[in-house]
Amino acid sequence: MKQILFVFACCAVLLTGCKKEDNKETPKTVSLRTVMVYMSGDNNLSTVVMDDIKEMMQGASGIPQNCNLVAFIDRNVGSEKPYIAQITKEAKLDTLYKYTSDFYASDPEQFSEVLKKITELRPAKEYGLILWGHASGWIVESDTIAQRRAYGIDTNKWMNITQMARALKGLKDQNVLPKLSFIFADCCNMMCVENGYELREVTDYLMGSPAEIPGRGAPYQAIVPQLFKSGSDLYKGIIDNYYDYYADYNNLDYSEKYTWPYMKDGYSVPLSVIDTKYIGDLADRTHDMLERATGGYPQYPDSPDLTSIAYYLYNTSNNSDVMYDMKAIMERLLSADDFKLWNTTYQQAVPYCRMSLKWMSQFWPQQQAFSYFNPDLQYGCVSMFIPRKGSGYSYGNMAYNKTSLNFGWNQVMDWKRFGWE
């Protein structure tokens, strides 16, 4: 699984430079769109990096003229150093830039440097960004580069969403990058409303899954042509091709069929899109509607009854279930009329989703929970944090009730009004 704490897990040192003779001159023409793929694979995903590159090459005939698909590739393979390459329309991998030293791809400054270099190599009017690697939504350990890993086999560094948002905003403020046309997160648990709010100034759309995704990630042979579309054609094309691929049991390999036999029943990957121009309205509406919860919103130390609502992450490090479906929460809290009013705003901010009540989870407690999820609730494939008592929430290394306050969304929610400090 591409899982836990958004993160680009990479084990190496600092960027020092590159050999001029190994790198190609910056083209003078400006393309219509360049899609940047940030492949942080210097970890336990290293072996599947090139599998996805090959899939991209299979779909490369769908790249329009005057558009580019460019990948930053960082793998844990011998003495190989990170490099930037273009997947051409002719299904070739054309190396554009080679680094001579390893560096932490999870360092926000290095993240910014790589994206800036891509804009120099393949300048365009519009840019899209694919985040490829490990992730776990809004969960943070600190607001600096964490010194220990939450997942994997090596000691590595991680980048939190707040840091990513600042890095992208810095590039935007410097006129290096315009506001991104989209961010497609091909990593776990990224579709939480907290992330959408944090990234609202740097991208038009955020797409991905609120849950774990398969280790193989997106079927890029089908996804690549969708990356160069716009509006609803863009997000529906990506979501539908991703969802339909895994819903077809014939597309699963032997190990997937053996490990997750329930996938034969047509389950897939929950997927959604956030339209960031409406996320501020959704924050304000949700803040107000919490006050109107039927019977009143519970005061500390009580919290809403979330029983049977789908949650998208079971954290085995502290035995906590977290990231409950936002739409289902609000449906349970509100009267029918108030939910209808709130849902009007929600559907503007989350215009499309495909739900599955089971997915390829590596966690046994999560798999057991699938049978308890209420299929009659309205799900929106975006999670929302709710403060609660208990392991993982009130104490421990992650202490969700405290660390969630790093995010602007939870500052708008103002959980203190319900007694949560």
Q: What do the PLM-derived regions correspond to, one by one?
A:
Residues 73-92, 103-175, 187-188, 193, ...:
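Catalytic-core segments of thiol-dependent peptidases
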Residues 46, 59-98:
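Active-site-surrounding "flap" and adjacent substrate/cofactor-binding loops of secreted or lumenal enzymes
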Residues 120, 144-185, 190-421:
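Terminal, contiguous helix-loop blocks that mediate binding/assembly
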Residues 4-13:
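Sec-dependent N-terminal signal peptides
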Residues 1-4, 19:
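Positively charged n-region of N-terminal signal peptides that target proteins for export
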Residues 13-34, 386:
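Bacterial Sec-dependent N-terminal signal peptides
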Residues 31-42, 91-101:
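Acidic/histidine-rich, surface-exposed loop or edge segments in extracytoplasmic proteins
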Residues 31-34, 63-70, 123-128, 176-182, ...:
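Loop/turn elements at helix/coil->beta-strand transitions in domains of secreted/extracellular proteins
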